[in-house]
Amino acid sequence: MAEFKVVVSDYILPDLEIEREMVEAIGGELAIGQCQSAAELIELAHDADAMFNTYFGPVGDEVYAGCPKLKVVVRFGIGYDTIDVEAATRHGVMAVNVPDYCIDEVSDHAIGLWLALGRKIVAADRMVRTGEWGMKPLQPVLKLQGQTVGIVGLGRIGKQMARKLSAFGVELLFADPHVGADVDLGGVACRKVELEELCRLSDAITVHALANDETHHLLNAECF
């Protein structure tokens, strides 16, 4: 009989065999679901000691009340987007994130999107596939060197964005009330400005901020 139970509320990985092996190696049981409602999650986790969560949410009072043995809930990600931390605290459940989750993957993808938009890569691909050719229909195709790129949120991913973007010869700005102007980026120049100035000066803006009450609707029509 297992000494404890760990549940995965939902997942996007191909499989969770590595996680199962790790849990079972220390005497636990791993139960896996793709929960779409609080009722489904409670059915899966009513006797669980720990929970891993990806996208299903919110994990709040109803779930915690229905899982009285639960001691910890872990978000597969940097932000607590799907976890009601205050509710977890009320029920004596520790809420944990993964602060180094996919830093390179997210920054690589964001830069890929910037390249695709600026250089019209997706539009050009669609043209070629339909038998069209030529640069004229794609104009303007932007020169990226010399652009001003604004980074909203200079956490781990934002900092990695700054380091990678510096190789393109762009001017970098950032807006983040929690990071000082003297932040060390290993020699990369990235000037701190207020959000209004960042929006006014930037050719492109990349947002790497937690989803919470402070950042909800942070960028809106008034910014542009």
Question: Where would I find each of the regions flagged by the language model?
Answer:
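Residues that mark the start of a beta-strand
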Residues: K5, Q147-T148, E171
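Glycine-rich Rossmann-fold phosphate-binding loop(s) that bind the pyrophosphate
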Residues: L154-G155
